[in-house]
């Protein structure tokens, strides 16, 4: 089944029509100042919003931010996001103090053609994330009443069966925004027949979080490079000592089985940066990955591993990267992530960064985002797509 697109909606004339755009404005906030720490997700929705503004639509944007547990919490207000969105659009964004209440209704009613409103955090209402279909549906009814058409441009949320993602499209003419369409095209290529050699780089802390995607990708890839905290469970499965490094004991046997079935495709670190403690200023040095001293904790892949991973990436035609190679938030343990990211960025391959912490690392390390073919805005969503799962938000757009 095909998905109707933003261009299909624009062709129908949207001047003066109220268009509800589900965006993913779930940006990280600085814990001290409350300011936006990374506006990448706001920038990602600009092509869709700009097209609607230029077409004269009355644009109503909605999003979640954080996990406020179904009631208003000023810590998770979208007000700062409205300010930044207005700066990026070059025009004021009208902010509604609630999501479907009096403020939302009056703010939307007052919009002129080509103006933009942002509703308060969707998750301030328990109906957004409710598992009760009636409660979720009632909230979806209220949201849908604010608009004449619906655009989903929140790829980072399409794996959630939430009211604004799954239920609202059933109540309004619905299309995919520019971002969602691009994500589906790119991930469809990776899930289908990508150009070979196809090399996947996986990091992050837990094997259990990536097990399903490893199972799905192993038959398709030529090499699978494993770094980050998850590598220590694989090293343990090979019989090596991992000191006090992160270890999922219950996953050791699973990793052993994966290594046996992988037939040499899985490449693990040969050296790691081990520290005396999990702290930015902890004493640390590089040790062999097959014998991490007891009471020491591996916090990054070592330089020999970076060189080996870079060599494995050199001849690739397609590269997918998800998850940092170490604790990149601490400068002493960011070298592995930087080295691998730079190897991917300088590759001639079709390169996809799989959202979440990987996308954050690209920006935090000051790397050129344009050097990558695509940086996904959906961490969990991109992995679930590659696992072959049905994503509720995509299914809703297809219906």
Curated annotation (Swiss-Prot):
**What EC number(s) has UniProt assigned to this enzyme?**
2.7.2.3
Q: Which PROSITE patterns match?
A: PGLYCERATE_KINASE (PS00111)
* Top EC group: transferase
Q: Name one Pfam family in it.
A: PGK
Q: Which of UniProt's keywords are assigned here?
A: ATP-binding, Cytoplasm, Glycolysis, Kinase, Nucleotide-binding, Transferase
Q: Which GO terms describe its biological process?
A: gluconeogenesis; glycolytic process
Compartments annotated for it: namely:
Cytoplasm
Q: Which reaction does it catalyse?
A: (2R)-3-phosphoglycerate + ATP = (2R)-3-phospho-glyceroyl phosphate + ADP
According to its UniProt record, where is this protein mainly located?
A: cytoplasm
Where does the signal peptide begin and end? none
Q: Where ATP is bound, by residue? A: 210, 298, 329, 355-358
Residues the entry annotates as binding substrate: 24-26, 41, 64-67, 123, 160
GO CC annotation: what is one? Answer: cytosol
Pathway, per record = Carbohydrate degradation; glycolysis; pyruvate from D-glyceraldehyde 3-phosphate: step 2/5
Q: Which domain of life is it from?
A: Bacteria
Q: Which GO terms describe its molecular function?
A: ADP binding; ATP binding; phosphoglycerate kinase activity
Under the subunit heading, UniProt states: Monomer.
Q: HAMAP family from the xrefs?
A: Phosphoglyc_kinase (MF_00145)
What the record says about family reads: Belongs to the phosphoglycerate kinase family.
Recorded protein name is Phosphoglycerate kinase
Species per Swiss-Prot/TrEMBL record:
Salinispora tropica (strain ATCC BAA-916 / DSM 44818 / JCM 13857 / NBRC 105044 / CNB-440)
- According to the entry, what is the taxonomic lineage of the organism? Bacteria, Bacillati, Actinomycetota, Actinomycetes, Micromonosporales
């Amino acid at each position: 089944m095909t998905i109707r697109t933003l261009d299909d909606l624009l062709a129908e004339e949207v001047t003066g029509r109220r268009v509800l755009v589900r965006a993913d404005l779930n940006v990280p906030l600085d814990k001290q100042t409350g300011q936006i720490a990374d506006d990448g997700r706001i920038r990602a929705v600009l092509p869709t919003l700009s097209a609607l503004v230029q077409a004269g639509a009355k644009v109503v944007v909605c999003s979640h931010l954080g996990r406020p547990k179904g009631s208003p919490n000023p810590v998770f207000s979208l007000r700062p996001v409205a300010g930044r969105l207005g700066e990026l659009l070059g025009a004021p964004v009208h902010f509604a103090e609630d999501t479907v209440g009096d403020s939302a209704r009056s703010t939307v009613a007052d919009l002129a053609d080509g103006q933009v409103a942002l509703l308060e955090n969707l998750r301030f209402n328990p109906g957004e994330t409710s598992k009760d279909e009636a409660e979720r549906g009632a909230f979806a009814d209220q949201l849908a009443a604010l608009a004449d058409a619906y655009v989903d441009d929140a790829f980072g949320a399409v794996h959630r069966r939430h009211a604004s993602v799954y239920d609202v499209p059933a109540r309004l003419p619905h299309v995919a925004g520019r971002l969602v369409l691009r994500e589906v095209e790119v991930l469809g290529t990776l899930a289908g027949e990508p150009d070979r050699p196809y090399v996947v780089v996986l990091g992050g802390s837990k094997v259990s979080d990536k097990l399903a995607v490893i199972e799905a990708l192993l038959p398709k890839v030529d090499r699978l490079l494993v770094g980050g905290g998850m590598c220590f469970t694989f090293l343990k499965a090979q019989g090596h000592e991992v000191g006090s490094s992160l270890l999922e004991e219950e996953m050791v046997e699973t990793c052993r089985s994966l290594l046996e079935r992988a037939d040499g495709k899985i490449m693990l670190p040969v050296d790691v940066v081990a520290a005396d403690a999990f702290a930015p200023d902890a004493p640390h040095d590089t040790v062999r990955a097959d014998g991490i001293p007891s009471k020491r904790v591996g916090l990054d892949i070592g330089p020999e591993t970076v060189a080996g991973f870079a060599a494995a990436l050199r001849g690739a035609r397609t590269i997918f990267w998800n998850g940092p190679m170490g604790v990149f938030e601490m400068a002493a343990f960011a070298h592995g992530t930087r080295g691998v990211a730079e190897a991917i960025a300088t590759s001639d391959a079709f390169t996809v960064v799989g959202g979440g912490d990987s996308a954050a690392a690209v920006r935090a390390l000051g790397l050129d985002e344009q050097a990558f073919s695509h940086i996904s805005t959906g961490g969990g969503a991109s992995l679930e797509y590659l696992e072959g799962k049905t994503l509720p938000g995509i299914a809703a757009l297809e219906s």
